[in-house]
């Protein structure tokens, strides 16, 4: 697996889609045709026009994000209309495009945070990059690998999500082995998160921890990490928009945790590196913020639990270069 920064992810994925012969599957919380993402969006449209099976799923939260609002209700702003136009254009080209989360009880419940791009048997996932201008500018990454088994599974999972949306339902979290690693998928059931549970279990075993996320940890995980030698990195409230700033202030107040993050670029990467008593290391990397709020509201997520030295060394290098 290779860690790619957001711009490299867009460029490499576009090049792969250009050569796609069978399938392209893209899912993200936010998808918009901005200058920073246009190369990939254009290649996705072209792939559908030449007969490749293309499926794209985006959360309706897109409308809020592109309109400069936390709430996904500005469907008629200029930028929101552009998002609607993008969806119509992709559908006209033959893309199976769907908006996720339209019928949820609240703006938080049932949100789809999962992110992946499957091109034939090439997979981009286990990172947090949203497919729009700000998403590309954030401190973030995606991992790229060629793995047919993973590609097949993610195409299947996207189908499950689409089916669940038709009846406004969710499905249980699942963990499954992938070679020597474990893929963790949260299906959106309220209070159920295999990703959060594994983070708590690993934290209990760890001697020291590097915690990186958009938000401060909350709940059981926060309590465990405070008892360990943990370096916490998450955004300062003044770096965020109004609602996110309120969330950060409230979470830090409740958890009584201070961030070590001193840089000025918005942090959106999400991973934890656990160092065990014997010196071995385990990492979780993906879309989950590791805040219990998301667990309570039932967000859909994906993450990888890994002991692979190559993956962990790439995360450590990313940490040293862009976060510490």
Residue map of PLM features:
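Charged, low-complexity intrinsically disordered terminal segments
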Residues: 1-96, 102-324
